């Protein structure tokens, strides 16, 4: 499968989205499902999905969160960032989703239609210490189930 960008940028992309999720929740006080909805409908999600180097590698997660929220509100937003000593569940989810989006070439919006952000976040306790391929396998399974359910509904 052709990927939107080289794996040389993948770690940067994962850190950027992870930091964006973390900043949205802990600096900007968004609930993750709300931020994810805003992000997945933003031009920044599309740029991320297509490998825009400025978005995936050229800025921090905090900067991405500021731009996504700013675009949504129609004004610039800046707050003193709150840094967590440990990697939060939100950070992990951003990190894992960036990898999965790159791996699957599935849009962030489509991913949210397959499984809710709340359910993805609930995967943290089981998957955060596993190799990322375990998360990929589970997401692939959920995608297949979703596609099969859709086909079943259409055939009824």
Where are these regions (language model features)?
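N-terminal interaction modules that seed assembly of large macromolecular complexes
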Residues: 7-67
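Amphipathic alpha-helical interaction surfaces
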Residues: 45, 67-78, 99-106
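Long, compositionally biased
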Residues: 53-89
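Generic structural signal of hydrophobic/aromatic residues within well-ordered alpha-helices
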Residues: 20-21, 44, 48, 64-68, ...
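A structured, charge-rich N-terminal accessory region that forms the first stable segment of a protein
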Residues: 3-4, 8-11, 87-107, 115-127, ...
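Alpha-helix capping and helix-coil boundary motifs
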Residues: 31, 60, 80, 88, ...
């Amino acid at each position: 499968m052709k990927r939107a960008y080289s794996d040389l940028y993948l770690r940067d992309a994962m850190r950027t989205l992870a930091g964006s999720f973390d900043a949205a929740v802990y600096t900007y006080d968004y609930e993750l499902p709300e931020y994810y909805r805003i992000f997945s409908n933003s031009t920044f999600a599309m740029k991320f999905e297509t490998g825009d180097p400025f978005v995936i590698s050229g800025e921090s997660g905090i900067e991405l969160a500021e731009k996504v929220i700013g675009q949504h509100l129609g004004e610039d937003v800046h707050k003193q960032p709150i840094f967590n000593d440990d990697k939060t569940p939100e950070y992990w989810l951003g990190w894992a989703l960036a990898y999965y989006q790159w791996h699957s070439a599935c849009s962030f919006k489509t991913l949210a239609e397959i499984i809710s952000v709340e359910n993805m976040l609930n995967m943290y306790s089981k998957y955060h210490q596993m190799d990322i391929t375990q998360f990929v396998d589970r997401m692939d399974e959920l995608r297949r189930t979703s596609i099969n359910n859709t086909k079943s509904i259409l055939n009824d």
